Amino acid sequence: MQSSVNEFLTPRHIDVQVVSQTRAKITLEPLERGFGHTLGNALRRILLSSMPGCAVVEAEIDGVLHEYSAIEGVQEDVIEILLNLKGLAIKLHGRDEVTLTLAKKGSGVVTAADIQLDHDVEIINGDHVIANLADNGALNMKLKVARGRGYEPADARQSDEDESRSIGRLQLDASFSPVRRVSYVVENARVEQRTNLDKLVLDLETNGTLDPEEAIRRAATILQQQLAAFVDLKGDSEPVVEEQEDEIDPILLRPVDDLELTVRSANCLKAENIYYIGDLIQRTEVELLKTPNLGKKSLTEIKDVLASRGLSLGMRLDNWPPASLKKDDKATA
């Protein structure tokens, strides 16, 4: 069985034919018979459904309360304007959400280039038409742009709180995917005497916010990560039980300085590496009395202060110190 697996062909040649800035054809060969459709269909579905991107998810237009309105001096109705906004190719650098503004009046065409952009926002298709204005027309709007993946209907983002404040805020169904079109064909390939092999040709087009080659690379990575779980699959594997750390009373994580002890007592404790209240309550009276310069008077003071907080000496903490308590913290305590 092992020898037959080793004899499986793996692709040795990949060719990228750049058709335009947004379109490319990727050829992969040779593949075993049937693997062209297997890989082609999987990559196509991932490219169309799982690529991250940005889209307009909400719009506020001056004088508009709902999407069935019409704006004086604007050729398009609100529904047409919203449809045009879905065609914007937007790229966010370092942010997941941003609000943009657009303001224009007078006769002319309103395009994506009229949108006021922040330094970390880029619109690829600046000539994309949003609306047409007459002489008395004016269009002022705020656009909320978010990062996402795949297709997300407006209802999926709207909470009860949003519904109470939704008048004038027009929600858009968002298609975040930067991939506009994907198709593939499987052709015949030949290696030496074998003529029944596959050659996969992917034809991919994006909106310009993502390079076609990078899109293929990301899709292949997603597919690889999903299949990796099967590589080390064991039939008798036991479910992994995560160990949960017991909760610790927050007061135990506070420094001993919060106890407001006398300077003498506080210095004696720190000399014994007792920085936190959790460190202190685990010491016994006998252990503390062995501390240099700490006498019975200081011991009584410590016991009284702890008692006022419902604590005492000689307590046991099984999970001390917690993992969240860094050693470096003690140096600054």
From Swiss-Prot:
Keywords: DNA-directed RNA polymerase, Nucleotidyltransferase, Transcription, Transferase. CDD domains: RNAP_alpha_NTD (cd06928). Transmembrane segments: none annotated. GO terms for biological process: DNA-templated transcription. HAMAP family: RNApol_bact_RpoA (MF_00059). The N-terminal domain is essential for RNAP assembly and basal transcription, whereas the C-terminal domain is involved in interaction with transcriptional regulators and with upstream promoter elements. DNA-dependent RNA polymerase catalyzes the transcription of DNA into RNA using the four ribonucleoside triphosphates as substrates. Homodimer. The RNAP catalytic core consists of 2 alpha, 1 beta, 1 beta' and 1 omega subunit. When a sigma factor is associated with the core the holoenzyme is formed, which can initiate transcription. Belongs to the RNA polymerase alpha chain family. This is DNA-directed RNA polymerase subunit alpha.
